[in-house]
């Protein structure tokens, strides 16, 4: 039997997680994707399949603020930004979708920053 690599294992974990976690209009899903250099977040309403709010380290307005920070510090900035944008859009409660990643490091830093920014999980 072939050995499963880390990426495939994460995808399997994410599929298993998605069976249990679904976003609604009242409580959308905060989805996290972590790449080698960047981190992306979206607030998604799964009933109609639309992205309500998004934030990532590739946002042009954050370029100067993120320069020289570690990836974990950048995740904190993104967590605060997604919380601010969500509250402006009238979203105060979300379901957290960690994307198959361990709740550790950048994912944990983003989640805690979003909580401190005013989002309820």
Curated annotation (Swiss-Prot):
Short name of any one Pfam family annotated for the protein: Ribosomal_L18p
Keywords (A to Z) from UniProt: Ribonucleoprotein, Ribosomal protein, RNA-binding, rRNA-binding
GO molecular function: 5S rRNA binding; structural constituent of ribosome
GO cellular component, one term: cytoplasm
Top-level division of the source organism's lineage: Bacteria
Swiss-Prot/TrEMBL GO biological process terms: translation
Function: This is one of the proteins that bind and probably mediate the attachment of the 5S RNA into the large ribosomal subunit, where it forms part of the central protuberance.
Family, similarity comment: Belongs to the universal ribosomal protein uL18 family.
Protein name: Large ribosomal subunit protein uL18
Species in which this protein is naturally found: Dehalococcoides mccartyi (strain ATCC BAA-2100 / JCM 16839 / KCTC 5957 / BAV1)
Name of encoding gene: rplR
